[in-house]
Each structure stands twice: as C-alpha cells, then as structure tokens.
C-alpha cells in the first residue's frame, strides 16, 4: 500500500500524448478566439458609434453647426458616415497633418480639460478639440486636436516630443490621417456623397454600380480635391451674449466691415447666440486674405473672452452634379423658387392688358429708406449666385441658362409702385404664351415633358429639401409644394400640376389661360365673381408674401412683449393723463363729429400725396375683393396713419415721447381703437361694409331664448303638481295565539306524554300552576317591582284594547 503512489494529473500520459500539451493547446486556442471576438466587437463598436460619437460634443452650437455643414478636409458626409481616421497607426506610414490624435485619455476627462491644458502651453493654439464619446456619453479614450496650419501642428508635436501628461497619465500623440476620399462614390440620381461601403444610395436607394458607370471616372476625385473658397467666413465659439458691435470692433483692425456684412445666428426662442456667426466680404479673395490673417494671429482672436475659430463657410448641401459630370450650385434651387413665382406673375400681368407696370420705389417716397438697404443686400447676394450659376451651367452643358436677371432681382424684399403704360400690341401680348410653350419641351433634363404620360406620383418617395422648403421627387427631378399641390421645375422655372385624367404634368399658366379664353364673353361677369379652384403662380407668390409679412409681425410683437410691466404702466398713466387733459381742452364736446369729418379729408390728402395706393399683394391681380386682400389693404393704409419721425398718431392727433409709447397707444388705447373702427368703416364700400357687419353678427352670440320671449311673451308658470297619496295595504300575518293556546301545541303533547292531564297542576304532586303564563306589558321607565309597572295586556290585544287597559290601570292607581 505504501509503495502504490497515485499518479498526479501533471504526470499522466497516454497513447494520445501528454495531457499537458493538450490543455495548453486548448487554452491557447480559446484565448485566441476570445481575442478575435473582442477585436471584432471593438471594431463593430467603432463603426457603429462613428457617426453619433463624432458629433457628441459639450457644445450644442458646434454640434448643430457640424451637422448642417459638409467638412471637406476631415471627410464628413451628409449620409451619416465619414471617412474614419486611422485608429490603428503604423509609425512608419504616419504622415504629417493638421489634426493630432491623443490616445489613452482618462475616461473622466472632458473637452474643456483638454482645451485648458492646451492653452496652458506656449506656442500655437488649436482651432478645435473633439473628444470621441459613445452613445451613453462615456469617453472612448481618444480625442482629435486640430490646428489652423500644418506648421503649427508639427511644431507643437516636436516641442512636446509626441508625449503629454494629463491627470498623471502619459498620453501618446499621433498624426491623424483620414482615409482616402476617392473611395467614396457620388449618386448620379440625387447627387448625394455616399460612404464607400454602401452598395446603395442612402437617400434614393440607387445602386452603386450604376452611378460608377454613369459618372465619368476621376470626376469625384477632382472635385473633392479642390478646396472650398467663397466670400463668406464663419466665426465659431462665440459667447451667448455677444453682439454685432463686439465682432465689428474685434475685426476692425483687419478689415472694414459694416453691420450688414455680419450675420449673428440666434436662437428663435431664447434670442441668445447659437455660437457662430457669418462674415460676408466683397469677394472670395478678400475673404481668403482675412482668413489667413485671423488664422496666423498669436495669440488667436478672442471676442468677449472666448477664443474664436475661423474657417470658410460651407454650403449646407452638396452641389448638384449633372449627368455629364459638371456641378451646379444647389442653392439656385431654393433661390429661384420664389423668384419664378413673382417673375411669372409680372409676365402674366403684362400679357393680359399691359396697362399696369410695377417698378421699384423712387427716392423720396414713403418706405424707400426702410427697404433701400435690404434691397441692395439682396440684389448683390442673388446676383452673385446667378453669376455663378450661369458660368457653371454654361460650361457644363453648353446651353443657355433660363434664369434671368429679372427673376433674380425680384427676390429682394421690395415695394412696388403702380404706374400706367400704353397698351401693348397683340403680338406683344402673345409673346409670353409662346415663350412658355417653347420652354415646355426644354424640361427634358429633369425627365418631365408636359403632354407625355407618366406613372402616378408616389409622395412617399419624396425627400424634404430644407433649403427650399419643398419636397424633391428623385424620379422626375421636380420640387413638390404640399400646400398648393404644385410641382416646380428648377430648370425651366415653371409650375406644373398633375392631371389624373391625362396622366401627365400640365403647366399652371396654361390652365389659367384656358379658363380665361375658353369661355364666351357673355359669361365673363359670372366668372369674375366665382373664385378659381386651383392656385396659379401669382397666387402662390401672394401666399409667400403674406407668410413673410406674418413672420415679421410676429417678430416685432415678440420683441415688444419683453418690456418691464411696472415702467409700462407708469408711463401709460402719465401719457394718458396728459393726453386726456389736452384732448379735453381742445376737443370739448364736438370731438367725435369733427373727427368723422376730418378722417375722409386726411385719407384724401394722403392718397394725393402718396401715389402708392395699393401694396404688393393687391397688385398681383384685379380680383382683390376677398377677405384676406381686404385686410392686407387696410393694414397697409393704417400704417400711414402714424408719423414715426415725429412720433405722432395722425388719427388721434397725439404726439408721444418715444416709439414704445406710440406702439402701446396703437395697441391698448380705447380712443385709438374707436377712431380706427370709424376710419375702417369710412374706407369700406357698401358691399364690404355689409360683409363686415354680417361677419360681426356671426361672431357675436345670438340669444335665441331672449328673441322668443320678446316675440311670444313669457308663458305662465305651470301649476304645482299634487303629491299622490298611497294607502298602505293590510298585511295578513299569522296569529296562532289570538284565540288562546289549545291542546295541539308541542308543549301540551310533551306534558301529556309525561303523565300530565289537562286541568291539573304541574309538578310531582300537581301543586303548580294550572293556567298558562300570560304576557304582560310594562311601562317605559318603570323598574321591576314598582307599583303600576305592568298592566294586563296580551299579545293578541288590539290597539284599542291596549289603550283601554292602560286607562283603566291609570284610573285604579289614582284611586
């Protein structure tokens, strides 16, 4: 037993070899499998978090800005992917770049910590710091630091010897080199730049193979390799309360700028800065020079204590690529949409009779100074866009661009003046119709030719275009307006509508001309009264103008609402008291009658002095008797009743110290409301006055019960109803002892069984009672044994017998 030694597991062996080798081999294989799975999972996490984490910054302004812009340098893409940076670096293949990658960062570090650490070093300062995060907000352990110039990045790396110490941890630094951009492909249908691994377009679902065949080789590579230059630069990391004057003061040593050259982006709700602004210069060369100056500043530019990042402003959308490989600016789609509507409306107005012409406001007229600056800015902006569009499109296809200067200039916010011109000849009247008919076949580049049959449009496939506000149809290339249900052709600048019977797209102008010329002259009067069911291009333009006015009014009301309440009330009391005293001295008793006589003279004089009779909305067509146009016409005329230079209300004949007091007077004063009501009624015709009274009657509550009482009188109240009395029915219940107890009861039978006989007493010797015990009623409140506490009353006695016995007992007690 002692010699038998048990073989240990480490010493076992067999014909299959040592178990040690087998266990080691299995362990190595399982360890390699786990390592492969972990590597695959980490790569999947990087690929899945690529889009969400790259935008997850501490600054929401920078997040919105990067989401709305295309970064050509770092390879951001509009479909949700970007050319990822090479995270697994090879030192031998590392190339110098402006972006430096910091690896091995602590999990608790933030972007602000990295930025503070970078600012503490002497030398060039970074332009941007981006910390990579997961969807949960936890840091992924690496970040990107971007410099303005390549020299700054290389000098900073050499000064720190590619190593940093952050929070007691050694951080490795590497140059970040993005993946090659020529691997990405451009969709030929919707012109979207897709990530290289996508086999179908992210937006329209087109195959990658078709786009690679149709697009000429080298087009995307040559386009993407060119840097983006424009006349506008963007300023990032602006403080929430920075104003335009501060930006102008900071940029004044480097460029001469005006207020209209700077656009500070603010939040619509909070009215605070969103963190960036745009500076537009006269040319792209000036913008490039200013950008180089600002990027070369040491220390960098600071406004209100915050370091400002400077770069070229990129477009929010990719440029459109024509089938032959040339590019056209996508901004022209949004810019020509409203211009085409206003241009077609002016063409249709000149083609109908030719007696009305709409020109710009002349110097000296009311409203000229207010709109002169805006008109100049808009004209300059859209002329630059139109010039770029014409040069690109003409070099691309060799055809003339249909965008005219009149259509571009009409985009500016203008007031039009109505003048009379001699009537044109019939040939001139026919020119607009012939031009539209000849332009219809020219819509072939978008795939839509009016008159040919097409499939029924599928609105579920449309994509929303933020720049124009329309929905883009990738199959036909048209832009769809859901409000008016019209399609817009961006090349021919025409509005179309879908005809279900003919299964084709029809021109909106043709439908309007058919309605006007197809009916006999006898029915023209009825046709003017009937409202057209379908909207034409001029009605769409009116809707756009009305919408713009409503937005401006909402902004003004929103600004005026933010005023201290106490100061408003005190100023209102002082002004109202002084105004009432002055009004009582001058007006006396005949104020109302004199005012009614004065208002028509005031309006007549205003019409003679101001040739601007009607606004832009009423000038589009002669049929302006509907309610919306009537309200707009009255509002435009009411604006003339206030003199904003003298701060006086011409209607009430009162002067105020400032603009706020005048605005409060117009909005809150009962006197102004009363005078305005009289003024409006005096300006209305009989038909309009009847329509207004009818609408007021409909808005008021109609007491039909009072009308019935006045007509038929008050009826007499009805007689009160008598309550019905029901007699309680007699209930027959069992009374077994009413006639006495007989010998048939159970107790009697039990006693007889024990030897008892009727008439004898109870007990062994028959010494007990012989009659049954009778029930007696005791008086309430009487104690046991008290005199008169009980009187003889059986349970079978009626109420009458019980009362008689009680009276007899009481009588005997009294004796």
From Swiss-Prot:
Belongs to the RBM5/RBM10 family. A zinc finger (RanBP2-type) spans 181-210. Residues 98-178, 231-315 form the RRM domain. Component of the spliceosome A complex. Binds to ssRNA containing the consensus sequence 5'-AGGUAA-3'. Regulates alternative splicing of a number of mRNAs. May modulate splice site pairing after recruitment of the U1 and U2 snRNPs to the 5' and 3' splice sites of the intron. May both positively and negatively regulate apoptosis by regulating the alternative splicing of several genes involved in this process, including FAS and CASP2/caspase-2. In the case of FAS, promotes production of a soluble form of FAS that inhibits apoptosis. Residues 1-93, 411-467, 510-539 are annotated as: Disordered. GO terms for cellular component: nucleus; spliceosomal complex. The modification Phosphoserine is found at residues 18, 59, 69, 72, 78, 444, 621, 624. GO terms for biological process: apoptotic process; mRNA splicing, via spliceosome; positive regulation of apoptotic process; regulation of alternative mRNA splicing, via spliceosome; spliceosomal complex assembly. Residues 743-789 form the G-patch domain. The gene is RBM5. It comes from the Eukaryota. Residues 426-446 have a biased composition (Low complexity). One of its GO terms (molecular function) is zinc ion binding. Residues 321-809 are annotated as: Required for interaction with U2AF2. Residues 452-535 are annotated as: Sufficient for interaction with ACIN1, PRPF8, SFRS3, SNRPB, SNRPN, SNRNP70 and SNRNP200. Component of the spliceosome A complex (also known as the prespliceosome). Appears to dissociate from the spliceosome upon formation of the spliceosome B complex (also known as the precatalytic spliceosome), in which the heterotrimeric U4/U6.U5 snRNPs are bound. Interacts with U2AF2; this interaction is direct. Also interacts with ACIN1, PRPF8, SFRS3, SNRPB, SNRPN, SNRNP70 and SNRNP200; these interactions may be indirect. This is RNA-binding protein 5.
């Amino acid at each position: 037993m002692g010699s038998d030694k048990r073989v240990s597991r480490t010493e076992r062996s067999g014909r299959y070899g040592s178990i040690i080798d087998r266990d080691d081999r299995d362990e190595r294989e399982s360890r390699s499998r786990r390592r492969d799975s972990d590597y695959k999972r980490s790569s999947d996490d990087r690929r899945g978090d690529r889009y969400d984490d790259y935008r997850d910054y501490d600054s929401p302004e920078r997040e919105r800005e990067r989401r709305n812009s295309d970064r050509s340098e770092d390879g951001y893409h509009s479909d949700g992917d970007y050319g990822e940076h090479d995270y697994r670096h090879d030192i031998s293949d590392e190339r110098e770049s402006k972006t430096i990658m910091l690896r091995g960062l602590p999990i608790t570090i933030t972007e602000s910590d990295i930025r503070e650490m970078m600012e503490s070093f002497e030398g060039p300062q970074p332009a941007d710091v981006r910390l990579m995060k997961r969807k949960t907000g936890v840091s992924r352990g690496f970040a990107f630091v971007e410099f303005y110039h390549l020299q700054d990045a290389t000098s900073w790396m050499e000064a720190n010897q590619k190593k940093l110490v952050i929070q007691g941890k050694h951080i490795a630094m590497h140059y970040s080199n993005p993946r090659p951009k020529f691997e990405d492909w451009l969709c030929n249908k919707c012109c979207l730049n897709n990530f290289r691994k996508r086999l179908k377009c992210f937006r329209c679902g087109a195959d990658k193979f078709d786009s690679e065949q149709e697009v000429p080789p080298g087009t995307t590579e040559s386009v993407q390799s060119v840097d983006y230059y424009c006349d506008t630069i963007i300023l990032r990391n602006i403080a929430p309360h920075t104003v335009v004057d501060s930006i102008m003061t900071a940029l004044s040593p480097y460029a001469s700028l005006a207020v209209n050259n700077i656009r500070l982006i603010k939040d619509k709700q909070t009215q605070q800065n969103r963190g960036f602004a745009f500076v537009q210069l006269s040319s792209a060369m000036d913008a490039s020079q200013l950008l180089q100056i600002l990027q070369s500043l040491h220390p960098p530019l600071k406004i209100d204590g915050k370091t400002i990042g400077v770069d070229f402003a990129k477009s929010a959308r990719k440029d459109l690529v024509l089938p032959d490989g040339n590019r056209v600016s996508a901004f022209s789609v949004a810019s020509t949409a409203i211009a085409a509507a206003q241009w077609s409306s002016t063409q249709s107005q000149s083609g109908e009779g030719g007696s009305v012409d709409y020109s710009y406001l002349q110097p000296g007229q009311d409203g000229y100074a207010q709109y002169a600056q805006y008109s100049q800015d808009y004209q300059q902006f859209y002329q630059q866009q139109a010039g770029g569009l014409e040069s690109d499109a003409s070099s691309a296809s060799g055809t003339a661009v249909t965008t005219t200067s009149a259509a571009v200039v009409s985009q500016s916010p203008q007031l039009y003046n109505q003048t009379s011109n001699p009537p044109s000849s019939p040939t001139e009247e026919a020119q607009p119709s012939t031009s539209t008919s000849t332009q219809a076949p020219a819509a072939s580049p978008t795939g839509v030719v009016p008159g040919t049959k097409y499939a029924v449009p599928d609105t579920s496939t449309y994509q929303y275009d933020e720049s124009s506000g329309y929905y883009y149809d990738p199959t036909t290339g048209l832009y769809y307006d859901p409000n008016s249900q019209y399609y817009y052709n961006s090349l021919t600048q025409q509005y179309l509508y879908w005809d279900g019977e003919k299964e084709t797209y029809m021109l909106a102008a043709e439908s309007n001309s058919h309605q006007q010329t197809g009916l006999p002259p006898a029915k023209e009067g009825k046709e003017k009264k009937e409202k057209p069911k379908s909207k034409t291009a001029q009605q769409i333009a009116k809707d756009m103008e009305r919408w713009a006015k409503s937005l401006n009014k909402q902004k003004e009301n929103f600004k005026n609402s933010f005023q201290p309440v106490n100061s408003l009330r005190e100023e209102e009391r002082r002004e109202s008291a002084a105004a009432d005293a002055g009004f009582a001295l001058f007006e006396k008793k005949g104020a109302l009658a004199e005012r009614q006589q004065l208002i028509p003279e005031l309006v007549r004089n205003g019409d003679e002095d101001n040739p601007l009779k009607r606004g832009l909305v009423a000038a589009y067509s002669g049929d302006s008797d509907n309610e919306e146009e009537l309200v707009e016409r009255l509002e435009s005329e009411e604006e003339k009743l206030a003199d904003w230079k003298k701060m006086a209300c011409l209607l009430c004949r009162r002067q105020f110290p400032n603009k706020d007091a005048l605005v409060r007077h117009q909005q809150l004063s009962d006197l102004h409301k009363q005078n305005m009501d009289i003024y409006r009624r005096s300006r209305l015709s009989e038909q309009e006055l009847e329509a207004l009274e009818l609408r007021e009657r409909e808005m008021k509550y109609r007491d039909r019960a009072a009308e019935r009482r006045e007509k038929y009188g008050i009826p007499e109240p009805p007689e009160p109803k008598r309550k019905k009395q029901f007699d309680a029915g007699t209930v027959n219940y069992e009374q077994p002892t009413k006639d006495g107890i007989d010998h048939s009861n159970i107790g009697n039978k039990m006693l007889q069984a024990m030897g008892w006989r009727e008439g004898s007493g109870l007990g062994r010797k028959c010494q007990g009672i012989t009659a049954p015990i009778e029930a007696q009623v005791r008086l309430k409140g009487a104690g046991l044994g008290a005199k008169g506490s009980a009187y003889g009353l059986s349970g079978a006695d009626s109420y009458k017998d019980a009362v008689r016995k009680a009276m007899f007992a009481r009588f005997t007690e009294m004796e």
